[in-house]
């Protein structure tokens, strides 16, 4: 993201003109959050680099200690995320017996979480949620369900906290993928799947595995993590978000699908319709990560109103 920095220029008029030109090329949202603006479309424009100076989702820059940690994360994830593991976790966490709290209380609780799988983010989680939501809100002002979906899409990361069992990072964050069928080569660090027990199981190591072509993603087990957990929380607590919102929540980390086009043989027509909204959402989810912070208290009343519209006051988690 672009951060305004005034450089010393002897002529103060030149300096003032430079700052004004920079501000004309940016969007300043309600919470004070600044995002780059496209001159062609007057809308959000994805930057080329993250705040660390690397390409977004750069998993090959092995010289960085941060990148090495991300690779080790995926090694562990690919080994341990099996079909049986996912079924076990869905059964346990589908009970929703860990806590009762509101959506906003969960947003605040999420500030205690660090996502070690993300090479682009080191700000508090609530900032990423609000940065994403505010950027979408500016470009899609009438789609309030999409604003709220952006706010809550990562709330399942509370699984990392002791109150929710303190699951290891590989069981909560990172890219997701179907289990019960072959691991597509589009998955990041695919080589580490060689340590996954399912790869040698004839039930699970074919293209369709335990599924049928066109069965629909609702019928597919995804690797366990914050996406699927928040999807279960929203559904079982009776959210009135449209199906596209639930689709975004469950599959926003499913990069092999929405970035590489893998696993499309499992989709049905409803999935294909919802995927269009996921593509919209992903641009903001990925590229709105910034060192420029949102004024939480300023935007809070708006998001509380959306929470009240689409969710009960208290949810079971």
UniProtKB/Swiss-Prot annotation:
Give the matching InterPro entries. Answer: Inositol_oxygenase
Q: What is this protein called?
A: Inositol oxygenase 2
What tissues has this protein been observed in? Expressed mainly in roots, stems, flowers and siliques. Low expression in leaves.
Q: Where in the cell is it found?
A: Cytoplasm
Per UniProt, Fe cation 2 binds at: 154, 226, 252
Residue numbers binding Fe cation 1: 128, 153-154, 285
The answer on whether this UniProt entry bears the keyword ATP-binding reads: no
* Gene coding for it: MIOX2
């Amino acid at each position: 993201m672009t951060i305004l920095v005034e450089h010393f220029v002897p002529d103060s008029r030149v300096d003032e003109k430079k700052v004004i030109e920079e501000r004309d090329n940016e969007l300043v949202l309600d919470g004070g959050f600044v995002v780059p603006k496209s001159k062609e479309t007057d809308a959000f424009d994805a930057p080329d680099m993250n705040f660390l100076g690397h390409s977004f989702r750069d998993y090959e820059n092995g010289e960085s200690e941060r990148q090495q940690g991300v690779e080790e994360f995926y090694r562990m994830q690919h080994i341990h995320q099996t079909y049986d593991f996912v079924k076990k976790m869905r059964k346990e966490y589908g009970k929703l017996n860990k806590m009762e709290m509101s959506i906003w209380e969960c947003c605040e609780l999420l500030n205690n979480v660090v996502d070690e799988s993300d090479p682009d983010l080191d700000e508090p989680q609530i900032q990423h949620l609000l940065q994403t939501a505010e950027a979408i809100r500016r470009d899609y002002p009438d789609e309030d369900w999409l604003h709220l979906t952006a706010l809550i899409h990562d709330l399942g990361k509370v699984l990392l906290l002791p109150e929710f069992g303190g699951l290891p990072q590989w069981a909560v964050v990172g890219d997701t993928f179907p289990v019960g069928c072959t691991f597509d080569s589009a998955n990041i660090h695919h080589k580490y799947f060689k340590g996954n027990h399912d790869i040698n199981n004839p039930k699970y190591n074919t293209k369709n595995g335990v599924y049928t072509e066109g069965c629909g993603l609702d019928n597919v087990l995804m690797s366990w993590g914050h996406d699927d957990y928040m999807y279960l929380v929203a559904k079982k607590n009776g959210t009135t978000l449209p199906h596209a919102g639930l689709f975004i929540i469950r599959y926003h980390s499913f990069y092999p699908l929405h970035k590489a086009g893998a696993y499309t043989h499992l989709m049905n027509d409803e999935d294909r319709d919802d995927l269009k909204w996921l593509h919209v959402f992903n641009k903001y989810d990925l590229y709105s990560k910034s060192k420029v912070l949102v004024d939480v208290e300023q935007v809070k009343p708006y998001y509380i109103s959306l929470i009240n519209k689409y969710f009960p006051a208290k949810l079971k988690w």
